[in-house]
């Protein structure tokens, strides 16, 4: 299980979303290698932030129309936000040594947590990914 809490700042003139604080808590069972677990949380969360804010796959009749990193806006090392990982240990008797999986669970709650933080910041509910500045501005204008 996992839960993410995000605090954002939204520029109402540009639609740009800036993540100010990000906390990611995950129940991992027994934390056999805490440093590795935190790395998985960082990586999964970075992927989720990319999906939430920048990454948009454009398909036309099944063909990828943005097949390069110039047009498909993946986060880079300079874009990754600081994440405060919280490792929760509840021993899972069914798992090896009491551990649970932590493969990509950091990815799953990212977009909803960011969407809720945007709503909390400006009162606009975004329901489509990625939540680009253009989509944020459009939602702000539609709210008025």
Predicted regions and their residues:
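C-terminal catalytic domains of large/alpha subunits in multi-subunit enzymes
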Residues: 1-144
């Amino acid at each position: 299980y996992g839960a993410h809490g995000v605090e954002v700042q939204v520029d109402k003139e540009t639609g740009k979303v800036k993540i100010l604080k990000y906390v990611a808590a995950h129940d991992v069972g027994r934390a056999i290698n805490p440093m590795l677990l935190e790395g998985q949380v960082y990586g999964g969360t970075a992927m989720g932030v990319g999906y939430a804010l920048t990454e948009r796959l454009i398909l036309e009749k099944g063909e990828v129309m943005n097949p390069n990193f110039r047009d498909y806006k993946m986060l880079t090392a300079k874009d990754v936000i600081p994440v405060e990982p919280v490792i929760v240990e509840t021993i899972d008797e069914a798992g090896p040594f009491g551990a649970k999986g932590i493969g990509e669970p950091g990815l799953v709650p990212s977009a909803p947590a960011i969407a809720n933080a945007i709503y909390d910041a400006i009162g606009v509910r975004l329901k489509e990914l990625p939540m680009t500045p253009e989509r944020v501005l459009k939602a702000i204008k539609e709210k008025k």
